[in-house]
From Swiss-Prot:
Gene transcribed to yield this protein: schE
Transmembrane segments: 40-60, 74-94, 105-127, 138-158, 163-183, 215-235, 252-272, 282-302, 305-325, 347-367, 368-388
This protein's UniProt keywords: Cell inner membrane, Cell membrane, Membrane, Signal, Transmembrane, Transmembrane helix, Transport
Designated name of the protein: Schizokinen exporter SchE
Membrane topology reported for the UniProt record: Multi-pass membrane protein
Species annotation: Nostoc sp. (strain PCC 7120 / SAG 25.82 / UTEX 2576)
Consequence of gene loss (knockout): No secretion of hydroxamate siderophores. More sensitive to high iron and copper concentrations than the wild-type. Impaired growth in the presence of either 500 uM ferric ammonium citrate (FeACi) and 0.5 uM CuSO4 or 1000 uM FeACi and 1 uM CuSO4.
GO CC field: plasma membrane
Molecular-function annotations in GO: transmembrane transporter activity
Signal sequence interval, chain numbering: 1-25
Length: 396
């Protein structure tokens, strides 16, 4: 079990670092440059590959890259492309070549989200059903540790050693993290039957959507983490408006808050085994949505570091528990032979909901204020908890 968890942890750390770095560092930088909230909200569109990756997941399910293994081969390929993109980005001057920078950021998101398809599929096949609670806690923890590096440590490094050397350091770390998958030997999986392109491409989607309660479940996935998506983006310009420095924001949101996410994800993994998926989704989701409202405290003008640390730790910890429960439930919806497509389609729906919510929240924050968007995002996510109780029942 331990080797499996170490492998998955390194994979999820590596793929989450660059996207987190761009999405978390850039809003802070843009707000410091006095850019408007509606413009910052549109940053969500740059992670569009995460919302559309289900479109190419059937190819990753069906095809393999020579002798590298099936999902292992795709992971190695996309990880090397990701590292190469980061190294190129290191030598781009953001102010003089903003378009080139945004292009590289989009490519990094594309390669990272594509690697995520193969990694999730590998995890589905690697973990037994009874291992998935802890396995998804490791996934959440790996993502969060990647976020600590990409969104916390990197903000501090940017302030100390500058853009170029920060990204070179990041690329070296990601290269080292590639070692476990290079030495891993993937077991051969049952191959899908040969068929026409049309049938082979659409069959996994049709199969998933034809399962009982598939559409209501996807609607739950669409709404469940919207509160997290909105607050994760908008709390950054809010803290800039409260006068916090780049290192301060890096420590609060990138290191301390995400450390709380790791601990709470591991706790959630153990609790999920005891409570089951549905009860965990309801309880963790309800608590997370209520604590989201704590962000109203800095929104109304409170700038005490002690208060901000406390609020951010509580919100991030509870949102992480809800996220872990959702990942576990999503994995249960997957078939082994179409693991990449089944899981990725659910993740894509979740990301599309988050992208739409962040873009809309940026526009609303400009006119209605931060407090309004925090209340609305919590209300929308609470709707998904209500839907779970209606479709599956609290006693499930």
């Amino acid at each position: 079990m331990l080797p499996k968890l170490i492998l998955l942890a390194t994979l999820y750390i590596s793929q989450f670092i660059p996207t987190t770095f761009f999405i978390q560092a850039l809003p802070v930088f843009m707000r410091q440059q006095k850019m408007s909230l509606d413009v910052i909200g549109f940053l969500g569109l740059l992670i569009l590959p995460s919302g559309l990756k289900f479109l190419w997941s059937p190819f990753i399910d069906r095809y393999r890259l020579g002798k590298l293994g099936h999902y292992r081969g795709w992971i190695i390929c996309f990880q090397l492309l990701l590292i190469s993109t980061m190294l190129v980005t290191a030598f781009i001057d953001i102010q003089d070549n903003l378009n080139a920078f945004l292009t590289c950021m989009f490519l990094a998101s594309l390669f990272s989200s594509s690697q995520d398809i193969a990694t999730d599929a590998l995890a589905v096949n690697l973990l037994e059903p009874q291992e998935r609670g802890l396995g998804n806690a490791i996934q959440s923890g790996g993502n969060i540790f990647g976020a600590i590096i990409g969104g916390g440590v990197m903000l501090i490094l940017l302030d100390k050693i500058g853009w170029r050397y920060s990204l070179i350091t990041l690329s070296i770390f990601m290269l080292i993290n590639l070692v476990p998958i290079l030495i891993y030997r993937e077991k051969s999986q049952h191959q899908l039957e040969n068929s026409t392109f049309f049938r082979s491409y659409f069959q996994p989607f049709i199969s998933f959507l034809s399962r009982p309660k598939a559409l209501p479940w996807l609607f739950v996935v669409l709404l469940y983490m919207m509160g997290d998506s909105v607050t994760s983006l908008m709390i950054r310009p809010l803290l800039v408006d409260r006068g916090l420095s780049l290192p301060d924001i890096g420590w609060i949101l990138g290191i301390v808050s995400y450390s709380a996410r790791i601990v709470s994800a591991l706790i959630a993994g153990l609790v999920i085994v005891k409570l089951g998926r549905i009860k965990s989704l309801i309880i963790f989701g309800f608590i997370a949505d209520l604590t989201t409202l704590l962000y109203i405290i800095p929104a109304i003008g409170v700038s005490s570091l002690l208060v901000l640390y406390t609020v951010c730790i509580i919100v991030n910890a509870t949102q992480s528990m809800a996220y872990t429960a959702l990942l576990s439930a999503m994995m249960d919806k997957c078939e082994k032979n179409t693991a990449a497509t089944d899981y990725t389609m659910q993740v894509s729906v979740m990301f599309l909901g988050g992208i739409a919510a962040t873009v809309l929240s940026g526009m609303l924050a400009t006119t209605m204020g931060y407090s309004f968007i925090f209340i609305m995002s919590a209300a929308v996510s609470l709707l998904s908890v209500f839907l779970i109780t209606q479709e599956y029942g609290v006693s499930s």
